[in-house]
Amino acid sequence: MAKPTSKDSGLKEKFKILLGLGTPRPNPRSAEGKQTEFIITAEILRELSMECGLNNRIRMIGQICEVAKTKKFEEHAVEALWKAVADLLQPERPLEARHAVLALLKAIVQGQGERLGVLRALFFKVIKDYPSNEDLHERLEVFKALTDNGRHITYLEEELADFVLQWMDVGLSSEFLLVLVNLVKFNSCYLDEYIARMVQMICLLCVRTASSVDIEVSLQVLDAVVCYNCLPAESLPLFIVTLCRTINVKELCEPCWKLMRNLLGTHLGHSAIYNMCHLMEDRAYMEDAPLLRGAVFFVGMALWGAHRLYSLRNSPTSVLPSFYQAMACPNEVVSYEIVLSITRLIKKYRKELQVVAWDILLNIIERLLQQLQTLDSPELRTIVHDLLTTVEELCDQNEFHGSQERYFELVERCADQRPESSLLNLISYRAQSIHPAKDGWIQNLQALMERFFRSESRGAVRIKVLDVLSFVLLINRQFYEEELINSVVISQLSHIPEDKDHQVRKLATQLLVDLAEGCHTHHFNSLLDIIEKVMARSLSPPPELEERDVAAYSASLEDVKTAVLGLLVILQTKLYTLPASHATRVYEMLVSHIQLHYKHSYTLPIASSIRLQAFDFLLLLRADSLHRLGLPNKDGVVRFSPYCVCDYMEPERGSEKKTSGPLSPPTGPPGPAPAGPAVRLGSVPYSLLFRVLLQCLKQESDWKVLKLVLGRLPESLRYKVLIFTSPCSVDQLCSALCSMLSGPKTLERLRGAPEGFSRTDLHLAVVPVLTALISYHNYLDKTKQREMVYCLEQGLIHRCASQCVVALSICSVEMPDIIIKALPVLVVKLTHISATASMAVPLLEFLSTLARLPHLYRNFAAEQYASVFAISLPYTNPSKFNQYIVCLAHHVIAMWFIRCRLPFRKDFVPFITKGLRSNVLLSFDDTPEKDSFRARSTSLNERPKSLRIARPPKQGLNNSPPVKEFKESSAAEAFRCRSISVSEHVVRSRIQTSLTSASLGSADENSVAQADDSLKNLHLELTETCLDMMARYVFSNFTAVPKRSPVGEFLLAGGRTKTWLVGNKLVTVTTSVGTGTRSLLGLDSGELQSGPESSSSPGVHVRQTKEAPAKLESQAGQQVSRGARDRVRSMSGGHGLRVGALDVPASQFLGSATSPGPRTAPAAKPEKASAGTRVPVQEKTNLAAYVPLLTQGWAEILVRRPTGNTSWLMSLENPLSPFSSDINNMPLQELSNALMAAERFKEHRDTALYKSLSVPAASTAKPPPLPRSNTVASFSSLYQSSCQGQLHRSVSWADSAVVMEEGSPGEVPVLVEPPGLEDVEAALGMDRRTDAYSRSSSVSSQEEKSLHAEELVGRGIPIERVVSSEGGRPSVDLSFQPSQPLSKSSSSPELQTLQDILGDPGDKADVGRLSPEVKARSQSGTLDGESAAWSASGEDSRGQPEGPLPSSSPRSPSGLRPRGYTISDSAPSRRGKRVERDALKSRATASNAEKVPGINPSFVFLQLYHSPFFGDESNKPILLPNESQSFERSVQLLDQIPSYDTHKIAVLYVGEGQSNSELAILSNEHGSYRYTEFLTGLGRLIELKDCQPDKVYLGGLDVCGEDGQFTYCWHDDIMQAVFHIATLMPTKDVDKHRCDKKRHLGNDFVSIVYNDSGEDFKLGTIKGQFNFVHVIVTPLDYECNLVSLQCRKDMEGLVDTSVAKIVSDRNLPFVARQMALHANMASQVHHSRSNPTDIYPSKWIARLRHIKRLRQRICEEAAYSNPSLPLVHPPSHSKAPAQTPAEPTPGYEVGQRKRLISSVEDFTEFV
């Protein structure tokens, strides 16, 4: 065969020549001959012949070898050479020679191969038939050269196979095997017959050799056989065995697998699998581990390996048994390979495995587990358990199709080596079969517990078994509880207390607790025994325990906590189930355990946690009146146990309870205990817990626990049944609490307190408990009571001051004998508390409550009263406190001033006025002076001993002695300087905008300014009314509603009446006219009553207030006939009668404001009626027309002021002047007849007078008539001499009574007056008033005083004059001159007009109306009471702005008084015109008025009020026009406004099951006995039909029976309350929704709800727009009640709903009423927020505003009636500099004041 390379090169050369690219190839023959042919010469042959020596031959052979490799020999040269050297191959020849010849042959074959031809066979034969087996390598080299490394066997084919077999016997080397590989690959067909033998020999070589290289090459040969030939079947077993063994060589693993894979891919593949399986099963190979391992490997890899042969159809089922057989003899390697193989099978082809396969696999796993017991192979153990885990994962994924029972048996067999997760699965599987449907399930459970709980150490496994046990118990306990507890629980869990694993202990304990909770058999005690052992573990840490290990150690005690908490749950269940003894034992165990805590001083955090939760539960225990114990559910509703009581059972009560109701199931609702002798009540005495609580208070070191106990104790103490049914010592509790506050050790022992913890926090926690303990005062020792009050006093200096004040207020009610001793010091201590918003309401309500307990402060000295005022005054500051607090402060001041002892009051007036000035007035001022007054310190350091002199008094103003003058003027000055200068401060002030936001929650932005203004006015008016109140009560205790006695009615019947407006008071003077005597003489009194000053018109009767307290006392005796009753409904007390406009037609008041009686309202008088038509002229003069009647000389003075009315009845003691012209006109006969009649009447009159003067002033009577008169009868004093002595004695007796009450008969009191009061009015209340004004005429009109300089402070602005309507001519140009102000502190100045400009009131000229509202500056001054002269003040005083000035009002640009503003008295023309005009005006009515007998009221008024120079126009009294019905109505409406506040409170009764039903509550017609007792204490029962709605405030209740027959009302000095009681109102069938009741109850701001339902009453149950606050009264046992407040969310800032008071039945009505009244005051303030401009006023403020509006209207009327008067406009209420730039500075006013007035006033102008 030619060499391929030469062929290739030849082809390339030919291709190049063909394409013309290469040089033409020369003739090869010629080329060979010329270039490469080597000629074998004879010489060469000779050198090679035998003749030459061996060495020469060998040398030559070497040279020819070199040539033969490179050059071609000539033809037949090779044969020649071979012939020459052939002999050298003989065996006897030297080795070198043989090797040289073989090398020559190799060279010739390599170099001359193409030309050898048949010589190749020759050479092959030489090698094959070599005489010896030597020279193998060289011969092999020649063979490799001949066959081109086995590829070409030309001429060698026939003998090649024999040569190979021969050679394999003698020279089987790796070199030959490599040649053999090529022989098989390229010439396999020549080897077929001998291939089996070759394979056998190679296999043997593989087995026998140790050379990996030989084996690798042998594998290459075998691979070539398999791939290029056909492996004989008979060679297959050996072939497989060889590979199975060879595969164990690590380096040959890959080629072996490749060879096997090639084999398995042939037609022998299945046979090979079979052979390998046979090998695994053959017992002969059982010990041959490498062989079995290889077989397992090949089978596994071939059938389910990574490169499996899909051509093989063997299933795992067919080969796995062989695997199983291969494990017959334990061998680690084989087992390992089998595990790897089947793990690979399971992971890859788990879904294809059938049940049979899984069975075999489980058999294999089982045998593996058996082998693990004998084979100590960690690797095998690991991989086997991994296999089990793999199968387990398949089970979890539901992909295991074998027998789970079989598998879990295997797992259980090796459970000790299995991981926890596997055992958890095993236990879960086992638990599925533990149920009653399985035979022996309890035994199985017991076995499971024994195997995996008692014998197992791993916690997770044991916990899992406990879960199984718990589940089994949960499912089957209802029917098998007995067996399970007996056989399993007690036997398996009895050792739990000693168990080492705390987690297992904890869970086992929880299991026992859960089981015990529902266990009702005798086994319950067995379970509790185990739990008790768990609880007995010590909670003390070991001494060597470090801090960082505390948490870990605490965790080991969790089972104790579980046991205790479990007992709490058990107790909660056992309370309501039988037998009751179970609850008793649990309760005792709990208490005993907590006692251990304090006995051994457990301080670990877990111990504190146990105590915390135990107390948290135990302090929820409650008891009802039947002593049944109960616990609140999650909704807070307490359910009481029918089987457990809180005391040691008594047979009587026990039997009574047994028969009280039917048998109820344990889980049913609470009810009476079931009947029958088997039922036995359990005793759970609270005293056990109580003792532990005492230990806690004394020893507890954890603040959280102590705080919880203190926080829960107040509510527990409400249930007195708990305390009193077993021996609980409240004395010890009180001692423990007090020692906590007083002892220093409490804070030292506490730990766990928050940062910054102090004694204050301790007080905050303890004080509520002490407050709750007050209700036990009857069971406390007096010492303990005092100690408790002392602790509360100490708390006043801490943050808990508000709670302490509330507690002390309860003490005041419940423990008066204790508090009365501590109260003087306590009140002084209260002054040290800073005035803060949080303290305001508790403190003021405490003082308000205390004021109504006069027995507590009857021993108060001045210091205590001063302290009360010092406490209250700072809260009148409107810039710091809301409106409710300010109003409440004023209420407290008024109450305490009235209740203050009379001798002290005078000194407190400057004290209070100074406080009001500093807190109220300065709060509206921008000056720094505002903050310079500290109410508390100043109040106590400057106690009011006497009035101080503010300015030196001015001399020469009166005729009084110097000392008295000094006293009077200094009093006035001090009063003016300290308190009355309201105007002085306010005019300069600016309203702080913060006031509105502080007091008005919902103010509209547009009304903020108006609200500010109204709010400012409100606080100033509060101040005015306060000062007015003090002036009223400073020297007397008379009530605010006078009652005219029957004798007074007789004396004054038909008398003449005039009313003056003096400051902020209305002074009405009524004089007698003698109609009583006329009737005695047989004359008709109707003649006199038909005149112009008749009192028959209902519009002129003085009306009493609607709610007269005196009426409440005298109503039973008064049955007044009434006409048709009109229903009077009111939204809030008294507001229905508030006067908005004063010019309301009289017809609107006929229904409700007319006097009861037969009188009818006459038609309105015509405006221009003539005198003749009004008064019939008598044609004949008789006795009655001229004789002074017996009743003449009497006068009544009625003063109406904001805080009430005062009335005096006085007689004129002056005899009639002998120079009277009237006497001369009287016939002597008629005069004597009259005197005789007087003597006959004397005795009767004397008796009547004494009786009348002995009637108390507080009783009510028909109001006096108000006839008007403009003339003074000159004969009015004639009768005085006849009864002068009698009257003098009578009045003196009255005076002495007053003097004795005041206690100062010898001194002249000095009065400090409120705004708008003159000294003379105040003097009317003094002892000297009767002597000075009734019996004395020392001040006569003839005694002219010298004019003195007056300071002019008021200025007027002349406006366009109004032209008179009469005749159309302009009126005389008149102006008035401002004088000294009258009312120093009038905060709302109105225009005050002189009567001389008004002219005679009787003149009825038509006047025009001005459209703009006209106002004037109001100023004030003082009046000297002794001389009735108006003294100058000299203090800068300006009126408070009220509204913006009209822009059209001109002012004097020069700042001086404008011309025409005043007129000089020296101008005769003007003065003459005025006098002439006035005379002409008065002349028309004088003749008629003079005919009316009696003293003209002007005479009386002038004696009291006249001064030669009043000063300012505003100081002058203003006479109300008699003819104007609108002014009469205004006065009448003022009388309709009560002089004290009114409140209406709803009272509801909530019965059992009614807490959520409005209809049921409103349908109640009666309540419980305790409810009835409560109503009785609320007030006085009144019968509605006997009540006059205008006398008694009923809050809208009908008096005709529409709203029932009775109700309750209550009153004190300054307020009256009526109670709308739902159960006293009729329940009508037609009114199904109870609307008749709800129209009253739904409109009441505050409701007292007597909640007897046992459930919570929620706000909103009674639906109403105005139900702001509920006072909830919840009756408790032992005659106690819980009183709490509920309010709407928008009221939360005003009412403190956190306060709950425990009050006894005896004091409940008082406390509930007080809380309701305070809440109603707050509600009225809140209600006013909806309209910020309608600030809530008290009735006093309403009266004050009404009087001020009346003054303003009178001034406006004066301006209309006198067009020549320049109208005086007041400055605006807004900031003057900004809005009225033309207003002059104060400096101008000061200058004006220094100008003297050069005129003397004409007093007839205002009378």
From Swiss-Prot:
Impact upon substituting residue 1749 to A: Decreased GTPase-activating protein activity
Effect recorded for residue 320 to F: In TSC2; uncertain significance
Record annotation: effect of changing residue 1681 to K: In TSC2; Abolishes GAP activity
Outcome of mutating residue 1271 to A: Abolishes AMPK-mediated phosphorylation
One GO CC term on file: nucleus
Keyword Cytoplasm annotated: yes
Biased composition (Pro residues): 663-675
Sequence ranges assigned to domain Rap-GAP in this UniProt record: 1531-1758
GO MF term (any one): GTPase activator activity
Cystine pairs: none
Topological category with respect to the lipid bilayer: Peripheral membrane protein
Region (Required for interaction with TSC1) location: 1-400
Name by which UniProt lists this protein: Tuberin
